[in-house]
Design a protein with these regions (language model features):
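Metallo-beta-lactamase
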Residues: 4-80
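Accessory terminal helices/loops
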Residues: 48-50, 61-129
Length: 129
């Protein structure tokens, strides 16, 4: 997911999940060391958990609805990059065509988004071999 050594702590009696940087709220997630496809799969699993409170690595407390929004946003981005790759576009060309409106309000958009698109593109490219 976010990194090769991700760890989350689940407190079942309290229904609290300490998620670390696997989950972030109001900030662009950092794809630099990520397996983005696995991260999206992990988000699908987390949103199915019966958590009352989720403590993200960055931002305010989350709930499963927040996780669902992050999951949809990341899955939509990955699918858009994948479609662009399959159409023969470069990551720079894809970046110009993607609808990033849901990402723009998030903290660190300018610093992170270009690198995230490039990282996901390279992952998709590697999987195609």
């Amino acid at each position: 997911a976010h990194t090769a050594g991700d760890m989350m702590i689940w407190l079942p009696e309290e229904r609290v999940l300490v998620a670390g940087d696997v989950l972030v709220q109001d900030i662009i997630p950092n794809f630099r060391d990520a397996n983005v496809r696995l991260w999206i799969d992990t988000l699908a699993e987390v949103k199915a958990m019966p958590a009352k409170v989720i403590i993200p690595g960055h931002g305010p407390l989350m709930n499963v609805e927040d996780v669902a929004r992050m999951h949809v946003r990341m899955a939509r981005l990955y699918a858009g990059i994948q479609a662009g790759y399959k159409a023969g576009l470069t990551d720079s060309e894809i970046r110009k065509q993607l609808d990033l409106s849901e990402w723009r309000p998030l903290h660190r958009f300018a610093e992170q988004m270009g690198g995230n698109i490039n990282r996901a593109y390279l992952e998709i490219e590697a999987e195609s071999f």
